[in-house]
UniProtKB/Swiss-Prot annotation:
Belongs to the peptidase A8 family. Pathway: Protein modification; lipoprotein biosynthesis (signal peptide cleavage). It holds the Pfam family Peptidase_A8. It comes from the Bacteria. This is Lipoprotein signal peptidase. The active site is at D120, D138. Keywords: Aspartyl protease, Cell inner membrane, Cell membrane, Hydrolase, Membrane, Protease, Transmembrane, Transmembrane helix. It catalyses: Release of signal peptides from bacterial membrane prolipoproteins. Hydrolyzes -Xaa-Yaa-Zaa-|-(S,diacylglyceryl)Cys-, in which Xaa is hydrophobic (preferably Leu), and Yaa (Ala or Ser) and Zaa (Gly or Ala) have small, neutral side chains. The chain crosses the membrane at residues 8-28, 64-84, 99-119, 133-153. The keyword S-adenosyl-L-methionine does not apply. Its main location: membrane. It is found in: Cell inner membrane. The gene is lspA. This protein specifically catalyzes the removal of signal peptides from prolipoproteins.
Length: 171
């Protein structure tokens, strides 16, 4: 009997993908560009267009970056799907991380391919200092990256514990 692979976590990619594109659609339908609605004293919903990547990286270039980021999202997503296929379903943290990154990357890729930019709308600030505006896909990618870091520390701790047990057994 074959074991279930990490591909069973792709439902999480689909959830991140759909929620991201749905929220972007709502923002585009309900907000004018740069319109901002105050939600909390440190948080606005603000419709902006990001022509670059995270923190508007490469946004001021002539347009080649759109194709670069589309290809990058496809390559990374393909690689992570391959990793999911190789992983055992019991590797829950790593599989969840990969799935969230895939969902976020593909959602931003579809947005970029369809619109030529990515819709961002979460705007956190303190006084005059604003954190770069972001979206659900960015959150999924960041949570996925954080889970990978957590998994790496967890794996390293297990290796150290296994070595200690091995040393005790040799005495």
């Amino acid at each position: 009997m074959s074991k279930k692979s990490g591909l069973s976590f792709l439902w999480l990619s689909a959830v991140a993908f759909v929620i991201d594109l749905l929220t972007k659609y709502i923002v585009v339908q309900k907000f004018d560009l740069y319109e901002s609605v105050n939600v909390l004293p440190v948080f606005n919903l603000t419709y902006v267009r990001n022509y670059g990547a995270a923190f508007s990286f490469l946004a001021d270039h002539s347009g080649w970056q759109q194709y670069f980021f589309i290809l990058l999202a496809l390559a990374i997503s393909g690689m992570l799907v391959y990793f999911l296929a190789k992983n055992n379903a019991e590797q829950k943290i790593q599989n969840s991380a990969y799935a969230l990154i895939i969902g976020g990357a593909l959602a931003n890729m579809v947005d970029r391919a369809y619109n030529g930019f990515v819709v961002d709308f979460f705007d956190f600030y303190w006084d005059i200092y604003h954190y770069p505006v972001f979206n659900i896909a960015d959150i999924a990618i960041c949570i996925g990256a954080g889970l990978l870091v957590l998994d790496a520390f967890k794996s390293e701790k297990k290796k150290v514990q296994d070595k200690q047990v091995e040393k005790c057994g040799q005495k």
